[in-house]
Amino acid sequence: MELKNLIREIPNFPKSGIIFRDITTLLSNTDGLHYTIDILTEKCLEFKPDYVVGIESRGFIFGMPLAYQLNVGFIPVRKPGKLPAEVYSVSYDLEYGQDSLEVHQDAMPAGSRVLVIDDLLATGGTAGATTQLIEKAKCNLVGFAFVIELKELGGREKLPKVPIISLIEY
């Protein structure tokens, strides 16, 4: 199945000159969604993670079923103020400003093997910040999985030297 055919391209969104890669058309396609989760599972089995960490919010969409298929726990990485217990927090730079991500301090025991998933790898900022959260938790990053990778933005080069899976490349 050619997953790229299930991604809708919206020109000039969210601003002029940008082509937005819309995954909602993939999500609404039953066969495409099943195939996406199945191929992610197949490719991520070798990582042998203890946990799948999904980045808010679209990382949750793919992370939960992947964790289920891998028979491991799921850990949400959230925007600030969304988690009720003690958190590790990391700030990171955006094109115009800063943002932060958080994870519960007791979400995963030190030494756990962690796989990070998100829908899209662009500049690597969000995935890089998630890496810092995993380091604060004293866990071991075993790999990244992305549905889409925007190669021209060079995000892969900014991430730790662990395996990186992307199903669709632009």
Swiss-Prot record:
One cellular component (GO) term of this entry: cytoplasm
Keyword Transferase: yes
CDD domains, alphabetized: PRTases_typeI (cd06223)
Pathway: Purine metabolism; AMP biosynthesis via salvage pathway; AMP from adenine: step 1/1
A Gene Ontology biological process term: AMP salvage
Cited InterPro entries: Ade_phspho_trans, PRibTrfase_dom, PRTase-like, UPRTase/APRTase
Keywords of the record: Cytoplasm, Glycosyltransferase, Purine salvage, Transferase
One Gene Ontology term of the molecular function aspect: adenine phosphoribosyltransferase activity
Compartments in which it is found: Cytoplasm
EC number(s) per entry: 2.4.2.7
Source superkingdom: Bacteria
Listed NCBIfam families: apt (TIGR01090), PRK02304.1-3 (NF002634), PRK02304.1-5 (NF002636)
Identification of the protein by name: Adenine phosphoribosyltransferase
Species this chain originates from: Trichodesmium erythraeum (strain IMS101)
Gene: apt
